[in-house]
Amino acid sequence: MKKNHLVKYLLISPSLPVGGFCYSEGLESYLKIKNLEEPDHIRNLITNELKIGQIRIEAKCLIEFFDIFVELKIANNINKNRRRLLSLDKWLLSFRDTVEIRDQQTQMAKSLFELTKEFGFEYLYEKNKNISWSLAWSWACFSFQINKLEMIENFIYAWTANQLSAAIRLIPMGSIKAQTIQLELLDLISEVSQEIVDSNINDLYVGNISLSMAQQNHNDLYTKLFRN
């Protein structure tokens, strides 16, 4: 694909339906429980998630999916790799503790698959299954020939921007402050991305379960955020 180094911006553009999602993934409940109301609290929360949170597992799975797509493209062990693809995706979705969170993932994945199909890259593997956002993102990057490091960096950047976008609606924080925090996190995003690329998936762990537990109250957030 021509100019594939620019195509990646389609995935994180807030002007597109895929980039326009603003789910907070339990952030509202977490802030309420912890009584966090300052922008610095949001920065610290995101920093902790990047260092020891679930986002690291999801990002690493991007590479695992990517490698499977490479194998499938060259028709290497097709049945085995398709089973591996489905198994890994089901395992990843199981990390999502509520129906709302899982629905969020599969809805976003469906939209991204529709986008890649418009570009001539229809997803052909288990496309009738509930599929995670991470798998869809990996498929898009594989199709657009985006390298693995950029894939991880863009994924984490987009996740961070999404959390900040949700935070603007939840606490007294303007968009300029949110952009400032995003800028301050760039070095960490780059560092974490390289670490994930270099790591083995079996060596990663989730050490911060607070945000995951807050997802248990996601239903209230789901209605409030979209009503606004």
UniProtKB/Swiss-Prot annotation:
One of its GO terms (molecular function) is nickel cation binding. Keywords: Chaperone, Cytoplasm, Nickel insertion. GO terms for cellular component: cytoplasm. InterPro entries: UreF, UreF_sf. It is found in: Cytoplasm. Pfam families: UreF. Its main location: cytoplasm. UreD, UreF and UreG form a complex that acts as a GTP-hydrolysis-dependent molecular chaperone, activating the urease apoprotein by helping to assemble the nickel containing metallocenter of UreC. The UreE protein probably delivers the nickel. Required for maturation of urease via the functional incorporation of the urease nickel metallocenter. Belongs to the UreF family. This is Urease accessory protein UreF. The lineage of its organism: Bacteria, Bacillati, Cyanobacteriota, Cyanophyceae, Synechococcales.
